[in-house]
């Protein structure tokens, strides 16, 4: 019976009977006004001329991660899907971050999702002036390994890439399996 249930479920997934994957969305195609970016920079420089403090988030999930997807379901009082474009807009316009990293769970990232994430990261970085970006978005994923003891439990690790060029990033994220 387990095989029959699994076969029916797998067929349903293949035929898209359980819904469709949300698209990555399109971030608002504008950077912060340059006067705001300049004011922020000058405020930091007036405090300490030798160092610059940057604020960022290195652990951001969208609804491409299974846990974030489940918590976003309206049946659980969630708001619905939050694609990567929402994360970009939140980082830029709400959280006023200097940088952030997209770190959806590797084991949930299909080739289609990974391709969408890479395109969305590039779109998120586009509105800003290349020489003076208002926000830097890094491509990444979360590698998770769960063991049954402290000796073989490695937990969650965020993998980040400095480049977003297609020929400089992996073809797929590598999960722990």
Residue ranges, per PLM feature:
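Extended, charged catalytic domains and RNA/DNA-binding interfaces, predominantly
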Residues: 2-177
């Amino acid at each position: 019976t387990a095989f029959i249930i699994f076969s029916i479920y797998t067929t349903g997934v293949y035929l898209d009977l359980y819904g469709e994957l949300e698209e990555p969305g399109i971030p608002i195609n504008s950077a912060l006004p340059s006067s705001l970016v300049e004011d922020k920079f000058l405020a930091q420089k007036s405090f300490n001329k030798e160092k610059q403090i940057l604020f960022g988030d290195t652990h951001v999930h969208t609804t491409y991660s299974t846990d974030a997807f489940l918590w976003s379901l309206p049946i659980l009082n969630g708001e619905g899907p939050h694609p990567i474009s929402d994360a970009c807009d939140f980082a830029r316009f709400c959280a006023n971050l200097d940088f952030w990293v997209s770190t959806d769970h590797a084991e949930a990232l299909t080739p289609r999702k990974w391709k969408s994430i890479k395109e969305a990261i590039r779109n998120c970085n586009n509105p800003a002036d290349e020489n003076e970006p208002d926000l830097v978005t890094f491509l990444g994923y979360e590698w998770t390994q769960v063991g049954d003891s402290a000796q073989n439990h490695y937990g969650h690790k965020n993998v980040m890439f400095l480049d977003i060029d297609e020929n400089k990033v992996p073809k797929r994220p590598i999960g722990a399996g």
